[in-house]
């Protein structure tokens, strides 16, 4: 599996995020609810240097709710504010500002005690590619998407989007790379669409997805493709061929693989979480 991230790209991305940190009060770290650990940057704590953080578990509508609750607890224990959202339909988005204020309550109180006027909270959205950063920015900005220009005390050229009167977001999200060394993580990222399709063999990813659903969500898999208990006992390659035939693709393994991947990705097999708390959250 070849990934298009090189040391030069990583250094540049890290530098760009680090340079912007000084302008914000808080960082909104966006993760995919289906893989809340695998969709994080491996050097994030080092990059953010203790900056207050709100972890936004995005695409919560596609994730297993019981797993999401456990991951919320996990991030809370790490000392982060956390909120499950779905940036596509605004679910949870209205709670972002109150959560950010909650995370910054001590700082805001100190400013008030010093006699400083109330001001908008400044934030930056960061995350790996395809986790929903731009969608979230557009959702918060609404139709107006008014850039506030160069705010006082901010380096010239930093463009901000105002959300109501209490929040200003850097217009450009911080893009970071996921951890690719682990093949398991690579497959998870591919299955959810975080990696371009041409970068992997589709049948490998389809087989990985089927293996996962057989282990954790067999009833959802059976329901989607009208499978019997006997079908679920087949080897995964044989099961993929059976599904391929059931979908009317005869023996076109590639088309069958594409269908399985996109069905999983689009939530047609139901809600699921690839990063299992019981395996990765301790």
Language-model segment annotations:
Residues 95, 99, 135, 208, ...:
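Alpha-helical scaffold segments in soluble metabolic enzymes
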Residues 1-26, 34-43, 47-53, 66, ...:
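Helix-rich effector regions associated with P-loop NTPase G domains
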Residues 87, 137, 167-170:
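Conserved active-site beta-strand-loop modules that form the wall/rim of enzyme catalytic pockets
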Residues 33, 59:
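Residue-level signal for short, function-critical loop segments
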Residues 29, 55-57, 125:
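Structural beta-sheet core signal
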Residues 107-111, 138, 144-150, 217-221:
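Short, structured loop/turn "capping" segments at alpha-beta junctions
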Residues 61-126, 145:
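Canonical P-loop GTPase G-domain recognition
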Residues 122-142, 172:
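Glycine-rich phosphate-binding P-loop
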């Amino acid at each position: 599996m070849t990934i298009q991230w090189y040391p030069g790209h990583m250094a540049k991305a890290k530098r760009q995020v680090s340079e912007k940190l000084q302008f914000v009060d808080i960082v909104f770290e966006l993760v995919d609810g289906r893989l809340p650990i695998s969709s994080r940057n491996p050097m994030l704590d080092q990059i953010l240097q203790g900056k207050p953080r709100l972890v936004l578990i995005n695409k919560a509508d596609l994730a297993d709710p019981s797993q999401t609750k456990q991951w919320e607890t996990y991030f809370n224990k790490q000392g982060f504010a956390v909120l499950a959202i779905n940036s596509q339909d605004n679910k949870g988005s209205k709670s972002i500002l109150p959560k950010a204020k909650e995370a910054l309550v001590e700082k805001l109180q100190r400013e008030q005690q010093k006699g400083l006027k109330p001001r908008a909270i400044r934030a930056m959205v960061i995350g790996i590619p395809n986790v929903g950063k731009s969608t979230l920015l557009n959702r918060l900005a609404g139709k107006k998407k008014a850039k506030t220009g160069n705010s006082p005390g901010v380096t010239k050229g930093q463009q901000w989007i105002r959300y109501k009167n209490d929040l200003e977001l850097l217009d450009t999200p911080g893009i970071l790379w996921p951890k690719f060394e682990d093949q398991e993580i690579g497959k998870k990222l591919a299955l959810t669409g975080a990696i371009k399709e041409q970068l992997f063999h589709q049948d490998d990813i389809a087989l990985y997805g089927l293996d996962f659903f057989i282990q954790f969500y067999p009833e959802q898999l059976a329901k989607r493709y009208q499978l019997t208990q006997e079908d679920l006992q087949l080897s995964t390659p044989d099961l993929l061929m059976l599904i391929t035939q059931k979908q009317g693709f005869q023996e076109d393994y590639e088309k069958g693989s594409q269908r399985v991947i996109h069905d999983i990705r689009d939530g047609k097999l139901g809600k699921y979480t690839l990063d299992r708390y019981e395996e990765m959250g301790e």
